[in-house]
Amino acid sequence: MSNVIVVGCGRVGSQLANMLSDNGSNVCVIDKNADAFANLGRNFNGSTVQGVGFDEDVLLRAGVEECDVLAAVTQFDNA
């Protein structure tokens, strides 16, 4: 099982997170807007962290030290 962090929970990020989670990956989603996590739906079984995806503390809370893959799918390069 791979550990994946998805930064950004918009249309693309939420679809990616759900697909990876459905396929058995351990997924954590980071987004600066807590309301964005509603895009994941009720069946998402991963975790979420509210914050900015380039903040070290946020990344540590998301499990970056055990992460196999990090996908940045935000609207902006610096989100």
Q: Where in this protein do the model-derived segments appear?
A:
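Cytosolic regulatory regions of ion transport systems
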Residues: 1-79
